[in-house]
Amino acid sequence: MLAPGSSPGQRGRLALQWRQVSWITCWIALYAVEALPTCPFSCKCDSRSLEVDCSGLGLTTVPPDVPAATRTLLLLNNKLSALPSWAFANLSSLQRLDLSNNFLDRLPRSIFGDLTNLTELQLRNNSIRTLDRDLLRHSPLLRHLDLSINGLAQLPPGLFDGLLALRSLSLRSNRLQNLDRLTFEPLANLQLLQVGDNPWECDCNLREFKHWMEWFSYRGGRLDQLACTLPKELRGKDMRMVPMEMFNYCSQLEDENSSAGLDIPGPPCTKASPEPAKPKPGAEPEPEPSTACPQKQRHRPASVRRAMGTVIIAGVVCGVVCIMMVVAAAYGCIYASLMAKYHRELKKRQPLMGDPEGEHEDQKQISSVA
């Protein structure tokens, strides 16, 4: 406030100063509002860590107003079942995405196309049955991937191509029966692989993956137990402990399949045979060609007892041969020592024993002198 005796000029200058301060304050407020990212409704946002927590809210869709600078987005424990391909568009700064404990059954091919800086992806406990081979192609920095507790029956070839930074991978509790070694070849820096609680069929289809597991363990990778479900002889046994003799029949099976491929192929078969046409009255029914698929012969591996028996017999034979070699060496040493002792005693007796021819000549000389 101005003093009562102030001049009109002073009052004008003071009003102008207040007007300038007001304009500056308004501009600062507007800039602060524009710079402050909006937080989705009912979600919790941390401006320091750039984390948006929308977990446990019963969401059926991804909030559309997630700030573009978000680095961590938590969407676990919701009711997400189907996501559009643009659900995470313009979130190129996102590093961690958690979609665990939802009802997702499929993921669009390009849903993670903008997540070029993603390092951790959690998809645990969903209903995912299939994955597109290009799903993770645009996330080369991914380090941790959790696909456990889903309905995956197979992994498409090329799914992990380009994921050189991947350190841990969880495939536990799915419906995987076998895996292709080529699918895991690009994971040169993988350190932890979890594949337990799957219905593994330890047959020829898993032979190459067994070789890869041995190489993975040799270079220091950590791998949980891969327990066989089939065949019955191997049920509950760790795949890594199965002798390689169990897979000797695989080469024979491949030879049989290759030789069978040289035959002239017949008509394509169908799983369900079509219904036979009704014959006309008075006409004899014509035999219809069979279109049912022949049942594929299932080759079962050799018995575990037979393989173990072979190993035991080989060990016994090697042991017997070693014992015989030790006995022969001992006998040779004893014989050599006895012969050496005999020769020493013989040398000692030679000076004491006279020459019989010399004694006979001496007797002749004595008789001649006499």
Swiss-Prot record:
Coiled coil: none
Claim: Membrane is one of the keywords in the record: yes
Keywords, ordered alphabetically: Glycoprotein, Leucine-rich repeat, Membrane, Repeat, Signal, Transmembrane, Transmembrane helix
LRRCT domain mapped to chain residues: 198-252
Signal sequence extent: 1-35
Subcellular localization: Membrane
Protein name, as recorded: Leucine-rich repeat and transmembrane domain-containing protein 2
LRR repeats: 69-90, 93-114, 117-139, 141-162, 165-186
Organism: Homo sapiens (Human)
Start and end residues of each LRRNT domain: 36-68
Biological process according to GO: positive regulation of synapse assembly
Gene name of this polypeptide: LRTM2
Extracellular side: 36-310
Region (Disordered), start-end ranges: 261-300, 351-370
PROSITE patterns from the UniProt entry: LRR (PS51450)
Regions crossing the membrane: 311-331
Keyword Hydrolase attributed: no
SMART domains: LRR_TYP (SM00369), LRRCT (SM00082), LRRNT (SM00013)
